[in-house]
Amino acid sequence: MFDCSGYVLRIYKQFGVNLDRSTSGMFSQGESVAKKDLQVGDLVFFKTTAAKVGHVGIYIGNGKFVHSSTSQGVIVTNLNDPYYWGKRYVGSKRVAS
């Protein structure tokens, strides 16, 4: 089972894209993308602690993203979930074209 950044790293590596191992490192890579301009494959980031970006997933279209947690495995979630992820969204990056 992967944590969030390990899952993203593995997926992108299959397509020949090299990413940093950490979520915060991934957040410093690529081109920033506005939420309204998200495309399939863009990375979406969330602030899970008061201090830093702590979670990453891959946008899959229709307002949803796929991500991994050590407790639930790989799951698909609504990006605009009003109870958790929607409130914690901090930005998106395009690292592959």
For every predicted segment, state its role.
Residues 41-42, 63:
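Structural motif
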Residues 1-40:
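Catalytic cysteine-centered active-site loop
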Residues 37, 50-53:
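Short glycine/proline-centered loop/turn elements that form peptide/ligand docking sites
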Residues 20-23, 55, 94:
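Short, cationic motifs built from Arg/Lys/His that form the positively charged side of catalytic pockets
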Residues 17, 28-33, 50, 60-97:
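Aromatic- and glycine-rich peptidoglycan recognition patches
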Residues 7, 57, 92:
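Short hydrophobic/aromatic patches on the structural cores and recognition surfaces of FHA
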